[in-house]
Amino acid sequence: WSATATRVSDDGRARFLRTAREAVASVEAHRVDKVVVVRRVVVEGAIEPRQLLDALAEESSVTRFGFSTSEHCFVGATPELLVAWDGRLVRSEAVAVTLARGRDLRELRESAKDRREHAYVVRAIHAALEGAGAIVSAVGEPEIRSLRHVRHWVTPIDGRLGADVHVLDLLRALHPTPAV
């Protein structure tokens, strides 16, 4: 696909890298349990949102999303499944810990820091689901999800909507997860 962008703004790269270093230091010093550092990239110009979503589809193990107004659109892809439902059955996924492709998977499985980080996200999602009125029935075993450039540790969490619970209640309770 091709698109023409008249300007791509990523003025925050240096700030992002500085913040990432500070976040790592805070985790290592046990001042925080988990930090996710993000940056905003703004593209101005003629880009067709559908083409962008199609390009994101090249990575099959992600959830794609998008919405638009008459003037703006927001599209993205994430390895995290926030919530899916079928009738009263619901599923979410705890996605935490990232390892670059090509690195040894034992690093991911044997790291005490990574196990703590992943367990933190699992507990947070479990608590959010129950706090919103879902009945959690199963927390699966962590598995490795391989994407084109990275791998993530993923744990499925299954449950059932309570009698008076709507799936939108779960969305409100889950977003943002500690993985976001």
Predicted regions and their residues:
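An anion-binding catalytic pocket shared by soluble metabolic enzymes
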Residues: R39-Y120, V136
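Short acidic/polar active-site loop segments enriched in Thr and Asp
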Residues: D33
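Contiguous alpha-helical scaffold segments within structured protein domains
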Residues: W1-A14, R18-R21, A25, V43-E44, ...
